[in-house]
Amino acid sequence: AAFAIKAREEILLGAKVNDVLVTGATGGVGSIAVMILNKMGYNVTAVSGKDSKADYLKSLGAKSVINRAEFDKDPKLIDKGLWDGVVDTVGGKILANAIVQTNSNGIVAVCGNASTNELNTNVIPFMLRGIKLWGMDSANCSIKRREFIWGEAAKLIDFNLLEKSIQTVSLEELIETYPKILKGEISGRVLVDLNK
């Protein structure tokens, strides 16, 4: 999440950005992105398949919440521009719809594939609106850059809120928890405590 947000900062270079969409917002990466973007002053719209988590997402800083069914459909060639930026953690049709709804010169930062690793889109939004699609590769980032980004992110994260979004399980409990993760029944992060 922090790497995606840093990329947005670097590429926009002071451009006016207000409305940012975060997909997979109840997940580990998405929830942190909502928190950080809100602290940076953006109007964050969260996308989630869990209507029951709207209050949770608003407590993290989302101004509004949209059900993922609005995005999980075949995209148009181009749609009304709604977002100055997007942080996508899911891929697939949700990402494709976010792309066609991105405003001129917006950036779409891709940092996950929770739904699928596929993306079927067209070139129209890129040609007509000049939007940018950036993949986040934190694995090959230098230690110096990681430390800088993590340090900046740490200033923006509410660790009390973050702690509430972490569920700790034992290795044995992970067997029961993992299918719930795959079904989208878990929000936030799951921490496996090997000493539990």
Predicted regions span which residues?
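Residues at the starts of beta-strands that form the adenosine-phosphate
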Residues: 19, 42-44, 107, 132
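Short, flexible, glycine-rich and Lys/Arg-enriched loop motifs at helix boundaries
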Residues: 11-18, 69-83, 140-141, 161
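Alpha-helical segments flanking ligand/cofactor-binding loops in enzyme cores
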Residues: 34-35, 55, 96-99, 124, ...
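Adenosine-nucleotide cofactor-binding segment
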Residues: 38-93
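Short internal alpha-helix immediately C-terminal to a glycine-rich phosphate-binding loop
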Residues: 1-39
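Short, well-ordered alpha-helical microsegments
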Residues: 30, 54, 95-96, 118-119, ...
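Glycine-rich phosphate-binding loop and adjacent beta-alpha segment
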Residues: 93-159
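C-terminal hydrophobic helical "lid"/dimerization subdomain
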Residues: 144-196
